[in-house]
Amino acid sequence: MNIQNRIWSSLALSLWFNLLFAQEVKFQKSISFSYETGPLISNGTDWGKEIKDAVDYKALDFQIGWRKISNTTFNYLYRYPTMGFGFNSTLKNYEEIGMPQSIYGFMEIPFSIKGLNRRVSFGYFTQLGVGFNLKPYDSLANPANKYIGSRVNGYINLGFSSRFKISERTDFQASLGLKHFSNGAAKKPNAGINLFPLNLSMNIKLGDINSIPSNSLDVPKKTLKSFWNLALYTGIRNYEIGDPTYFRGGLGLNYLVEPAYKYRLGLGMDLFWAQGMRLRFPEQSFSFKDQTSLAIVGTWEWQLTERIFVPIGLGAYLYRNELNQEISWFYERVGARYRFNNNLSAGMQIKAHKAKADFFEFTLGYTILGKR
């Protein structure tokens, strides 16, 4: 496992650990066992269709969760979500992609508080973690798999769920989600593996049965706040199959306002730098500007708790260099960060062009409170 994957593994799990235990200690504990099956999504190429036809995805999943039932502001706003950890494993070792497995943190958010007391309820979920035990591309041993170039990858799963209450202790759940394995172009090829499984699970509450608060919370009125965000991005990038990996990084400056508990939004600038251009193209000469790109970026931060937030960005380049595989005039960003105090934060995002990964941004941020 290389350095980036070690960082990704520890960061993803520590984020969810803090998300679970940093706020309060009152939970309804539960475990769930599930079976899932569904198609691997082809990218439309001949080799992609070949792998899709060869992989009949079937897997087992185990989760341990904690529904937050303390009557706090964020618990109430997110309708008493369930958070926890899970392990997923395919049932078969496929010749083309190996035996994908993952360890992840998850968050399930109901669509309504009233629905939690009904026999049938609905919600949505996200899973974030580390995928491993994949069989990567090899020009001799596995030339067909151009989806993934590394054994260890980032893992994400997003979807919707429906829950049917069997008893006070037991629920049946069905969910549909999009699973994605990617190394963020740290090692090519990296088209990414996408799966669209149906998951059927049995959920069992542990210990005493604790009800969610019956009284609505009087949420304090939110005053408008503003912030300056400084960010340092670091990562690695592989440009061609079999070539070395190079450093990618950058700096960001954003001005944000916080009109509501759940989000901040604003505008800023990003400066990116790409190492290795002289090594990749020794016959050419490059200026500092050739090795950099500059962009205006709109930012939206989804606040999950007082500490955890999801940064989402859409940037437009003022200038860029296509030799650095910045293939479009705009880029997207999404990730997760943990705020250690009112100022310092750390986390990881993925920067992409038209949903095609550019690099994983391991980020250190510093926030300064603006005028109220």
Spell out what each predicted region is.
Residues 29-50, 72-77, 97, 114-156, ...:
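Outer-membrane beta-barrel translocator/channel fold
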Residues 27, 54-60, 79, 97-103, ...:
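Residues that define the transmembrane beta-barrel architecture of outer-membrane proteins
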Residues 194-214, 338, 357-372:
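Outer-membrane beta-barrel "beta-signal"
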